[in-house]
Amino acid sequence: MRGAKAEAFVVLGLRLMAVSFAVVGILFIAVPSGVLDTISDVGEWLGNDTRAPHTQEDLWLALAFAYMVVIAGICLVAQMDVVRYRPLLLVLAAGKTASSLGSLAFFLIDEHVFIYLLNFLVDGTLALLALWLWSLAGRIGRPADPG
C-alpha cells in the first residue's frame, strides 16, 4: 500500500486508536473496579480464576488516565499530517511496548492474573500496529510539510 491509500489508512487507524484510548481512559477513571471485575469475569470464563486485585491508590488511576489522554493526543496530532508527525508513532509504540512488557512481568513474577496477560497481548499488538502505521506513513511518497 502506497500513496494516498496508505495515508488514508494510517489516518483512519490513528483516529480509531484515539477514540479507543479515550474510551478506555474514561472507563479507567470512572469505573476502575468495574473494568477489573469485567475482565476478571472474562478470564474466569476462559479458565483463569485469579481475579485482578482492586486498588484504592488513586494516584495510579490518575496516572493511567493521564497516559491514555497522552496516547490519544499523540494519535490525534499524528493523524493531522502523518508524514510530518510520523516520529510520534515510534513514541506510541515505545509506550505500548513498555506497558505490554511490564504487564508480562507482573503476570510471570507476581500472580497469573488474566488482565496482566490480556494487557500484554493487547498492548503488544497495539505496539506492532503503531510500528506498521509508522512503516505505512513512510510509503506515502510526499515530503513532510515544514509547517
Where are these regions (language model features)?
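Hydrophobic alpha-helical membrane segments
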Residues: 88-103
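Membrane-helix boundary elements
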Residues: 11-58
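Membrane-helix boundary connector in multi-pass membrane proteins
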Residues: 101-118, 135-136
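Juxtamembrane helix-break-helix junctions at the cytosolic face
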Residues: 72-87, 107
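Membrane-water interface at the C-terminal end of transmembrane alpha helices
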Residues: 124-147
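Non-cytosolic membrane-interface motifs at loop->transmembrane helix junctions
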Residues: 87, 91, 111-122
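Short, Lys/Arg-rich, polar N-terminal cytosolic tail immediately upstream
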Residues: 1-8, 144-146
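Core segments of alpha-helical transmembrane spans in multipass integral membrane proteins
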Residues: 23-24, 47-79, 93-97
